[in-house]
């Protein structure tokens, strides 16, 4: 599994997305935050594993200081990780890995999904909200991301594999590690934002280009 934080909006109302993409199926999970501190990484990782139905054998990170404290601290390839991440890795059983410095492209699967997320979900949702005089924030984004993931993103024919991620996920699941007992709250289950039809997110993107400061 490849994980990343992608910036949706900077400034005094930041919006960021934790994104996890599986290697074989390309199934993805998203959780929005207004920061990317260590607790956000841990929450995203927990929820991603429960969303997919199991824990992957390995999780690939970038070189964020909230994840890795010192590269090669104990020898080549033997890094000093954030202790909270190590505790989570032990709880779920996965092995953390980190990209080589200045080689973030090794997380290409999740990076490509980041662009798709912004084009297909963030920008159209922000436009629909703006028409109603509302702004896209963390709680609203999390209220709508669940249905989009389940009904659109993970049900589309993937551009690389040519197959549906949700279907390929069933082939990937037998290789996952079993989940711990405790269940977290998934995005949208406690949100109070009004429901929005999924078809409202499917307009031509040219309508929305100037609505968000999006780093694609």
Task: Please annotate each region the language model reported.
Residues 30-58, 78:
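Active-site beta-loop-alpha junctions of metal-dependent nucleic acid enzymes
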Residues 61-62, 75-76, 94-119, 136-137, ...:
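RNase H-like two-metal-ion nuclease catalytic core shared by retroviral integrases
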Residues 1-28, 36-44:
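Mobile-element integrase/transposase regions
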Residues 77-96:
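Two-metal-ion acidic nuclease core segments, chiefly of the RNase H-like superfamily
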Residues 114-216:
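Active-site-proximal acidic segments at structured loop/helix or strand boundaries
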Residues 14, 70-74, 108-112, 163-166, ...:
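Short acidic, glycine/serine/threonine-rich loops at helix termini
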Residues 54-77:
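Acidic/histidine-rich, metal-coordinating catalytic segments
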């Amino acid at each position: 599994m490849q994980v990343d934080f992608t910036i949706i909006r900077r400034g005094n109302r930041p919006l960021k997305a934790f994104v996890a993409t599986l290697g074989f199926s390309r199934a993805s999970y998203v959780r929005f935050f207004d920061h990317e501190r260590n607790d956000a990484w841990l929450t995203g990782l927990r929820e991603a594993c429960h969303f997919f139905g199991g824990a992957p054998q390995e999780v690939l990170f970038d070189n964020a200081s909230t994840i890795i404290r010192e590269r090669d601290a104990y020898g080549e390839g033997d890094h000093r990780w954030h202790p909270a991440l190590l505790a989570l890795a032990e709880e779920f059983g996965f092995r953390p890995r980190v990209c080589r410095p200045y080689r973030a492209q090794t997380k290409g699967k999740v990076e490509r999904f980041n662009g798709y997320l912004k084009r297909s979900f963030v920008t159209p949702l922000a436009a629909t909200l703006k028409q109603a005089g509302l702004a896209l924030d963390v709680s609203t984004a999390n209220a709508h991301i669940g249905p989009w993931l389940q009904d659109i993103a993970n049900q589309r024919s993937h551009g690389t594999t040519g197959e549906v991620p949700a279907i390929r996920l069933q082939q990937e699941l037998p290789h996952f590690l079993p989940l711990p007992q405790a269940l977290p709250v998934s995005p949208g289950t406690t949100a109070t934002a009004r429901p929005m039809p999924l078809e409202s997110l499917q307009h031509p993107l040219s309508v929305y280009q100037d609505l968000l400061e999006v780093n694609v």
